[in-house]
Amino acid sequence: MISSLSASSSLVSSFVAVKATPVTGPLIPRRDLLSIRIRASSNQNSSGYCFPEKFKSFAKSAILIGAAVSMTGKFSTLPVKAESPVTTIEKTYEEVKEEKLSEITPLSELLDSTPEAVETLRSLLQQKLEKGEDEEALKLLERLVAAQPEETEWKFLMARLLGEMGRPENARQMFEEILQRNPLSFEALFENALLMDRSGEGNAVLQRLEDALAVAEAEYLVKEARDVRLIIAQIHFLQKNVDEALKSYEQLTKEDPKDFRPYFCRGMIYSLLDKNVEAKEQFAKYRELSPKKFEVEGYLRTPLSKMKLFGGSEEN
């Protein structure tokens, strides 16, 4: 039986990371590495508080649903840490810290000429984040972004880290840079929308998404248009416009009954509403349609969410 989310956050944490093979094609462009960092916060265990309070307590579930909906591309789990000894990692990092971006040995040249350097720095970055050394991680990311401005993976990592460090405006600026290159990037649109909504720009965020939808429709990008509509539905839910969100998911299901994502989202919403019978029906349909290898992995329990390798077919 689907248990009520008003009693526990365990169901919420169980649907954060998703592995899957594409259903209707890769949802987002391929990126070599992506990190979603969310620190778990304790939720109220009382089931007696009113509907608005319940949504306030579980507002972060909107992030959860969006993450699950977005990650329908093929990707693997946490990469094996670099086999290089710690001393080698630290040595490379010291070289990066001491490197003055001179004409002789700029960091970009080091990364281009030394294949192991990127993986070594990636492993070091992961260590810094896991230890909560945010400032050190940010400094490293700033250098990586400057050295490899075309690599959106570093910008995604940096944006998410800035958001968690309480610097939403800087995070949004980074997402905007990503969107300048790929205006229909699902994750950049979604996460930027979340930041806008948290900043009290409720109407502006919906207009921003409507503009993105118009771009997709004007270019006859059916898949991208559908993805933006999924984000819009999610924002409606986040803004407590539950009926509108459910209506949107229902319309998306009518247009493509084989897409499991709207079923998943409706199941999550019904769970939040303690409508367990309806939630069970939606989750059953979602499991029926999702790929056989589709997995849901809870990793919200860790202080730092995992780094992942994406293996889609599209390029940014």
From Swiss-Prot:
Tell me, which GO biological process terms does this entry list? chloroplast organization
Pfam families hit by this protein:
TPR_16 (PF13432)
Q: Where in the cell is it found?
A: Plastid, Chloroplast
**Top-level taxon of origin:** Eukaryota
Keyword field: Chloroplast, Plastid, Repeat, TPR repeat, Transit peptide
The primary site where this protein sits is plastid
List cellular component terms (GO). Answer: chloroplast; chloroplast envelope; cytosol; plastid
- Tissue specificity statement from the Swiss-Prot or TrEMBL entry: Ubiquitous. Preferentially expressed in newly formed green tissues.
User: What stretches of residues are TPR repeats?
Assistant: 118-151, 152-185, 226-259, 261-293
Q: Does the keyword Transmembrane apply?
A: no
Result after altering residue 181 to K? Abnormal chloroplast development and slow greening
Q: Could you tell me which residues form the transit peptide?
A: 1-39
> What PANTHER family does the annotation carry?
CELLULOSE SYNTHASE OPERON PROTEIN C, TPR REPEAT-CONTAINING PROTEIN MJ0798
What is the annotated role of this protein in its UniProt record? Required for the early stage of chloroplast development. May be involved in chloroplast protein biosynthesis and/or degradation.
What protein name applies here? protein SLOW GREEN 1, chloroplastic
- The species this protein belongs to is Arabidopsis thaliana
- Phylogenetic placement of the source organism: Eukaryota, Viridiplantae, Streptophyta, Embryophyta, Tracheophyta
Q: Which gene encodes it?
A: SG1
